[in-house]
Amino acid sequence: MILAGRASRSMTGWNERIALAEKLDAPVLSSIKLAAAFPTTHRLHPIPPFQGLPKSAAALIKSADVILALDWLDLAGTFKQAYGGEAIGAKVIHVSCDAHSHRGWSADYQGLPPADVYMLCETDAAVPLLLEACAKRTASVALPAKPALPPIPDAVSLRTVAVALEEATRGVRQRRH
């Protein structure tokens, strides 16, 4: 599975992240705390972006055999929410430059996540190399069904606004200035 965190805004990087997820047939999670790093309407993005880890996302993380964290914000906290005190059963590949900002005396790094492989680089440097090096895979875990929106929502939520905006702008091309 892929935790899509901080990434550049380049179309090349965007397309490479999609290609990697598709090649690995890996579900992708994203956080509402960060700018989009993966299309939330993609079939491999089964859970809407979140702030606190929902149970469905925790279950998906716990079922993964490999977790590729692409500069995920507070990876240690996410693992703590998903696994509690249990050992992490997946191999963890952590791509991040966070180590440059960690100062041990101030403990301003939240928590240090376990990693089987730590790649000290930005997401856009790692993804093309991973895309080239990885073999195509078929998912071993079924994706959870995307929750349907009620026909007329009782309240306005970020998700209902996002879905309405996506539906209203589907097929509209951005003008270049």
Regions inferred by a protein language model and the residue ranges of each:
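Anionic-ligand anchoring segments at beta-strand to alpha-helix junctions in alpha/beta enzyme folds, i.e.
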Residues: M1-I67, A168-H177
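Flexible, glycine/proline-enriched loop segments at strand-loop-helix junctions
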Residues: L3-R6, V117-Y118, L149-P153
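Active-site glycine- and acidic-residue-rich loops that bind
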Residues: R6-W14, L73-A76, D154-T160
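A short acidic, amphipathic alpha-helical/loop segment
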Residues: G13-A19, T78-Y83, A164
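Generic low-complexity, intrinsically disordered sequence content enriched
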Residues: L24, L75, C134-A135, P147, ...
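Glycine-rich, acidic loop regions that bind phosphate or pyrophosphate groups
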Residues: L34-P144
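Active-site diphosphate/adenylate-binding microenvironment
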Residues: L143-H177
